[in-house]
Amino acid sequence: EEEDKKEDVGTVVGI
């Protein structure tokens, strides 16, 4: 799950 979180964080920052 940590790996997926990294990608999610990038998207959240964009928003």
Swiss-Prot record:
Gene Ontology biological-process entries: maintenance of protein localization in endoplasmic reticulum; negative regulation of IRE1-mediated unfolded protein response; negative regulation of protein-containing complex assembly; positive regulation of cell migration; post-translational protein targeting to membrane, translocation
Catalytic EC class: hydrolase
Location relative to the cell: Endoplasmic reticulum lumen; Melanosome; Cytoplasm; Cell surface
Keyword Transferase part of the UniProt annotation: no
Gene Ontology MF annotations: ATP binding; ATP hydrolysis activity
Activity regulation summary: The chaperone activity is regulated by ATP-induced allosteric coupling of the nucleotide-binding (NBD) and substrate-binding (SBD) domains. In the ADP-bound and nucleotide-free (apo) states, the two domains have little interaction. In contrast, in the ATP-bound state the two domains are tightly coupled, which results in drastically accelerated kinetics in both binding and release of polypeptide substrates. J domain-containing co-chaperones (DNAJB9/ERdj4 or DNAJC10/ERdj5) stimulate the ATPase activity and are required for efficient substrate recognition by HSPA5/BiP.
UniProt remark on domains: The interdomain linker regulates the chaperone activity by mediating the formation of homooligomers. Homooligomers are formed by engagement of the interdomain linker of one HSPA5/BiP molecule as a typical substrate of an adjacent HSPA5/BiP molecule. HSPA5/BiP oligomerization inactivates participating HSPA5/BiP protomers. HSPA5/BiP oligomers probably act as reservoirs to store HSPA5/BiP molecules when they are not needed by the cell. When the levels of unfolded proteins rise, cells can rapidly break up these oligomers to make active monomers.
Keywords: ATP-binding, Chaperone, Cytoplasm, Endoplasmic reticulum, Hydrolase, Nucleotide-binding
Modification comment: In response to endoplasmic reticulum stress, de-AMPylation by the same protein, FICD, restores the chaperone activity.
Swiss-Prot/TrEMBL catalytic activity: ATP + H2O = ADP + phosphate + H(+)
Disulfide bond residue pairs: none
Protein name in UniProt: Endoplasmic reticulum chaperone BiP
Subunit description: Monomer and homooligomer; homooligomerization via the interdomain linker inactivates the chaperone activity and acts as a storage of HSPA5/BiP molecules. Interacts with DNAJC1 (via J domain). Component of an EIF2 complex at least composed of CELF1/CUGBP1, CALR, CALR3, EIF2S1, EIF2S2, HSP90B1 and HSPA5. Part of a large chaperone multiprotein complex comprising DNAJB11, HSP90B1, HSPA5, HYOU, PDIA2, PDIA4, PDIA6, PPIB, SDF2L1, UGGT1 and very small amounts of ERP29, but not, or at very low levels, CALR nor CANX. Interacts with TMEM132A and TRIM21.
Function: Endoplasmic reticulum chaperone that plays a key role in protein folding and quality control in the endoplasmic reticulum lumen. Involved in the correct folding of proteins and degradation of misfolded proteins via its interaction with DNAJC10/ERdj5, probably to facilitate the release of DNAJC10/ERdj5 from its substrate. Acts as a key repressor of the EIF2AK3/PERK and ERN1/IRE1-mediated unfolded protein response (UPR).
GO cellular component, one term: melanosome
